[in-house]
Design a protein with these regions (language model features):
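Short, low-structural-confidence N-terminal segments
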Residues: 1-67, 178-255
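Solvent-exposed aromatic/hydrophobic patches embedded in short alpha-helical segments
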Residues: 67-85, 89, 96, 101-109, ...
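Short, low-complexity, polybasic intrinsically disordered segments
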Residues: 111-113
């Protein structure tokens, strides 16, 4: 990351210089960053609560584990992305947060999340809000890919991969989508992905083997993997471009 460097230690304005913090040191500055002409300071409390509850890092003496450089960097990068989302005019509604939570976490109950992940209810809500915001930024910059990981076909009860059924044929045709011509019972284009995969292994709409279904599965998975990799690379390039514009200072951490 351009502009990144580790600063000197010390408390107060200079930040944290020990592995543990007392209660009154939680609001000490542990890092600062400049992005788009704006300078922001980060306190130990903010860095810790970006991933944990204070109680989680509190020891038996009433002190708190100082946030690591990795935790702080993660927090700063997240803030830069959120700043970018704000610049793009991206916001999320309560309904969108609820949908995101249910899709990604399995529940939209913030109390349940708090208990499950060891954070406060307010933290859980904030994490969902930020994550949903970044998801919208991702879709805006990368695109909302329709690619989804395929589900493997059900193995035959007898373990014979040559076992044939209409279910396996339906499975293949469903994965192939528009590449299959249902009116003619064959491939629309001999040069299409699935047509090539089955060039020497024909099947009908009424019957296909488990082995053939697995061929379709591997084909679908390769397509999914390729699209996912492309999207990941595009997002990484975008995010790194933002990070390169930031100057980040971390002050004397030893956690």
């Amino acid at each position: 990351m351009v502009g990144f460097f580790i600063g000197n230690g010390g408390f107060g304005g200079k930040g944290v210089g020990s592995a543990t913090l007392t209660e009154d040191q939680l609001d000490s500055t542990v890092a600062s960053y400049s992005y788009n002409g704006k300078k922001s300071d980060i306190t130990a409390r903010e860095a810790i609560e970006s991933q944990y509850s204070l109680d989680t890092v509190k020891d038996s003496d009433g002190n708190y584990t100082a946030p690591s450089a990795d935790v702080i960097l993660s927090y700063v990068r997240n803030q830069i992305l959120l700043d970018a989302a704000e610049d793009e005019g991206i916001t999320v509604s309560s309904k969108e947060m609820k949908q995101y939570a249910e899709d990604s976490i399995g529940t939209s109950d913030y109390k349940t999340m708090a208990t499950q992940y060891g954070v406060s209810k307010d933290q859980a809500k904030q994490i969902v809000r930020q994550s949903a915001t970044l998801q919208k930024l991702y879709k805006k910059k990368v695109g909302d890919s329709s690619a989804s990981m395929p589900t493997a076909p059900t193995e035959p009860a007898d373990g014979n991969e040559e076992t044939a059924s209409k279910d396996y044929a339906d499975y293949i045709i469903n994965l192939a989508g528009d590449e299959w011509d249902s009116s003619k019972g064959t491939w629309k284009d001999a040069d299409s992905t699935y047509a090539k995969a089955f060039a020497d292994d024909a099947f009908t709409a009424d019957s296909a083997t488990y082995k053939q279904a697995m061929t379709a599965y591997y084909t679908a998975y390769q397509q999914y993997s390729s699209q996912a990799s492309s999207a990941s690379s595009k997002w990484t390039e975008y995010a790194n471009g933002l990070y390169a514009k930031a100057n980040i200072s971390i002050y004397g951490l030893f956690a």
